Design a protein with these regions (language model features):
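Ubiquitin-like/PB1-type beta-grasp interaction modules and other compact soluble beta-rich domains
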Residues: 1-85
């Protein structure tokens, strides 16, 4: 079973990947936020900004989400760098 999700990229991640968002049909086995990050990082150079170990935050349907949070069909996943204030 495949599922389509909406992915949004913000700030420096948007610049690194060259787009602000996309709709993506996920391959089998990509069922969590962490698995999605790994899948996207495998696309190549600019996408390495999403690789594990990089300081990237994720939100699922506008709520903060860890790597082990499951993704469902029609979900919106946003990736962004940490925000600091001062």
């Amino acid at each position: 079973m495949t599922m389509k999700v909406k992915i949004l990229y913000f700030a420096s991640l948007r610049e690194a990947v060259g787009q602000s968002g996309e709709e993506l049909e996920l391959p089998a086995g990509v069922e969590t936020v962490g698995a999605l990050r790994a899948h996207l990082a495998g696309r190549g150079e600019g996408w390495q900004a999403l690789a594990a170990g990089r300081n990237v935050r994720a939100a699922l349907n506008q709520r903060m989400a860890g790597a082990d949070v499951p993704i469902g069909a029609g979900d919106e996943v946003a990736f962004f760098p940490p925000v600091t204030g001062g």
